Design a protein with these regions (language model features):
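Active-site nucleophile and cofactor-binding loops and adjacent substrate-binding regions
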Residues: 3, 70-72, 122
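Glycine-rich phosphate/pyrophosphate-binding loop and the adjoining helix
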Residues: 100-137
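Glycine-rich phosphate/nucleotide-binding loop
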Residues: 9-109
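Short acidic loop-to-helix transition motifs that present clustered carboxylates
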Residues: 1-8
Length: 137
């Protein structure tokens, strides 16, 4: 399937594409597009898996333009760590993190990047958002 048709297909029918194997450049486009459906690249977790090794990481970049400003959204990294814990069989720890994360969002406490998109939410700094998640554990 060519890339433009694939991008349309995954956006219209994301549940039909739980696993995608493609070249790195194509998956970069697809991951950005699909991340938009769940809040953006700041919230979407990332994993690279093989039979021999797996890496769990935030989905994109280092954002040098916001370094040191305490405004980065740590959700992608937190959810990647949660996914890693589930993958290695530490399900209880995984559930604690995902439950605390979900509770924090339900309390309408989110980072600035998402608060700009959702009315009625409290915009928190990176560190305050992390503290709220920890408090909900």
């Amino acid at each position: 399937m060519i890339t433009d048709a694939f991008l349309q297909e995954v956006l219209l029918n994301p549940k039909d594409h739980d696993v995608v194997a493609t070249l790195n450049l194509n998956v970069d486009y697809a991951s950005d597009a699909l991340a938009a459906q769940v809040g953006g690249i700041g919230i979407s977790p990332g994993a690279n898996m093989s039979d021999e090794a797996s890496i769990f990481e935030a989905t994109h970049g280092t954002a040098p333009n916001i370094a040191g400003k305490n405004i980065a959204n740590p959700s992608s990294l937190i959810l990647s760590a949660q996914m890693m814990l589930e993958y290695i069989g530490w399900t209880e720890a995984s559930y604690v993190i995902s439950g605390a994360f979900e509770k924090t969002l339900k309390e309408n406490k989110i980072t600035e990047d998402l608060a700009n998109q959702i009315k009625g939410c409290e915009a928190l700094s990176t560190s305050d958002f992390a503290k709220e998640i920890i408090a909900n554990m």
